[in-house]
C-alpha cells in the first residue's frame, strides 16, 4: 500500500533494492543497467524503478541524504513492500591514504555519531553491521569482476559540516571511509530481520583533498553498481536452492 513517501503499490518493488542517495543516480542506474525499467515512485522527486538484470527482478530507489532520510525509505521498503534486501550504492570520503578515487568499499560495520539506535531502548551500544550473506556475495562478485573492494568499517555521520572535525581520529581506528547512511540502514535491517549492505565508491579523500566532480559522482560508479547487481543475482540464486 502507498505510504506518505511512496506511491508504489504492493508488489511494485523487487525483493532486492539498490539504494543510491541521489534520485538522478537512481534514474541513471535504472536506465543504464536494468531491462525494461518502470518508474514506480516519484513522490518528492525520490525516484524508484523496477526492472530486471540478467532476468532477475531488481529495483532501484533513492534514499536522499542522511540517516533520517534513508531511515524512512528503507523502513517502509522492508515493512510495507516486503523487500528482503537493500544494498546502498553511494559515495564516501576516504579516511585512508591508499584509497583512490573510484575505489569501492564495503561496510562490514558502521560506526556512527548518531543516536538512531536509541529508539530501541537498549541497555548498551548497538553495533550496526552488514548482513553476512549479502557481504559474502558482494565479495565474491567483486572477485569475479576483477574489482578491488576493501572491506571494513564505515563512519556514518549525522553532520556533513562537522565543527569538531573528528575524521582523523576515526582514521586512526582503521575506519575506511565516512558517509551518512549505512548505520541507519543496518539498524533498520536488524530491527525488521531483513538484510542490509552498504557499498560505497570513493568520491573524495579527506586526507589528500582529491575529489570527483558532481557530474562524475553521478555516472562514474559503474564498478560498484555491477558488484551490487551481481550480488542481487547471487541472492536470488541462493534463495532458490
Predicted ranges, named:
Residues 206-241:
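His/Asp/Glu-rich mid-to-C-terminal helical/loop segments that flank catalytic regions of hydrolases
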Residues 19, 26, 66-70, 127, ...:
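Generic structural signal for well-ordered, non-membrane alpha-helical segments
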Residues 125-174:
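Active-site rim beta-loop-alpha module in soluble metabolic enzymes
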Residues 83-84, 176, 195:
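Short acidic/polar active-site loop segments enriched in Thr and Asp
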Residues 183-217:
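Zn-dependent metallopeptidase/amidohydrolase metal-coordination segment
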Residues 35-42, 146-153, 235-241:
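Flexible, glycine/charged-enriched surface loops at secondary-structure junctions
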Residues 137-145, 188, 227-238:
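Generic non-transmembrane alpha-helical segments
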